[in-house]
Amino acid sequence: MIKKQERLVITFYTTTAAMAMENICKASGADGRIIPVPSSITADCGLAWCAKNESEDALLDLMVQCSITPQGIYHCLV
């Protein structure tokens, strides 16, 4: 079993926003991947962006530039 690590988890209001996040991150080479929302978090959309904690500032800047609004930003074991 893979050991859980503390990660940055960004949730979204819609699946469209989660998919947009995936597209812009892939295009820009940003850290992270789409995951199902962890059971410890409640969100409107069932998908979340998971990345290393150190990537938080860069990802938030990218989201502002691309007008993607997060529902929540968490640091949790994933």
PLM features: residue spans?
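A short linear hydrophobic-aromatic micro-motif
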Residues: 31-37, 71-72
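Short glycine-/aliphatic-rich beta-strand segments at the starts of folded cytosolic domains
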Residues: 2-11
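Short, charge-patterned binding micro-sites
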Residues: 39-47
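Short, flexible, solvent-exposed loop/turn segments with mixed acidic/basic and small polar residues
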Residues: 1-2, 34-40
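Short amphipathic alpha-helix segments
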Residues: 13-31
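Small/polar loops that bind or transfer phosphate-bearing groups
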Residues: 10-13, 51
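C-terminal structural segments of small proteins and small subunits
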Residues: 50-78
